[in-house]
């Protein structure tokens, strides 16, 4: 039997679909799952990146604000110290304020007004440094940066210093200092009021001084007087030399950097008339040495050049409690190294050491260089900070 041929106009029989083609055209379920999962991860990653970026911006602004706060706090701290020893630059009247007083003699040193009083209840001599007029100009610009050092002979260690007044020959001090001395002992004392020209990069120059034998003063009532400055006698103490170093403090990093630059006119320690100097740098806290650094040794010289930097970690909340002590020593290959002199800087040191420290804090991130006169090792110990 043969099948009937299809008649004209009748539809052709349908061919059943090929199952292999169906399998090739369909998308597997695991592919769809992978696509969905990948898309989700991509969206999540994008959102996470945006979130992290915003967080970093916020943290950056916060850290920047904290850094600004640290800088401002340290600057204010430095200004508070400067206010104790060194005011801002003042434009004071440079003409003599006393009628008819003119500085005609080019060798005239100037004059100083002071006051004296004795408090019998507390046993204290009160010395007032009021003002000076017509001081000698020791700077190249025709002016001076005067301050007054006050002490009672024979004790030179207990000194008081006024603030430094910038660029004036007629400073108004208005400061009072107290010396605790029994009244019966005052007759053998001599009051010395020495006027100096402050110089950051060299030794402070003596303008002149006033000496008042206390035996010649009637302290039954307050005394106020003008005295002409006299040429200061040469220091009796042996010169040990000078050292120049810079201080730099970065409050945001809590980093204190001391750069030992150079020394000059050091005391001769060797038989041949020279020395082999090096410098030890100590960081002290509470009067105790907590860190130590030292420079290289410079052979056969009294004017060594170092330019060596040392860094210490000092948190912002500890900067008032630390001091830095620099000791210049003479290296001895066979015997014991002998100290030539020391100098200390810090908030509790006073004098030039406090002045240098205050300038450093008032100018964070900037190195502040200054010359210091070396003191005998037994007299240069810093005062323990509170």
UniProtKB/Swiss-Prot annotation:
Membrane topology label: Single-pass membrane protein
Protein name as annotated: Synaptotagmin-5
Positions that bind Ca(2+) 2: 138-139, 197, 199, 205
Family membership noted in the UniProt record: Belongs to the synaptotagmin family.
Region (Disordered): 1-21
Cofactor requirement: Ca(2+)
Binding site for Ca(2+) 4: 270, 276, 330, 332
Subunit structure and binding partners: Homodimer. Interacts with both alpha- and beta-tubulin.
Natural source organism: Mus musculus
PANTHER family recorded: SYNAPTOTAGMIN, SYNAPTOTAGMIN-5
Function recorded in the entry: May be involved in Ca(2+)-dependent exocytosis of secretory vesicles through Ca(2+) and phospholipid binding to the C2 domain or may serve as Ca(2+) sensors in the process of vesicular trafficking and exocytosis. Regulates the Ca(2+)-dependent secretion of norepinephrine in PC12 cells. Required for export from the endocytic recycling compartment to the cell surface.
One Pfam family in the UniProt entry: C2
Any GO CC annotation of this UniProt entry: dense core granule
GO molecular function: calcium ion binding; calcium-dependent phospholipid binding; clathrin binding; phosphatidylinositol-4,5-bisphosphate binding; phosphatidylserine binding; protein heterodimerization activity; SNARE binding; syntaxin binding
Residues at which Ca(2+) 3 binds: 199, 202, 205
Entry-linked Gene3D superfamilies: C2 domain
All copies of domain C2, residue ranges: 108-227, 239-372
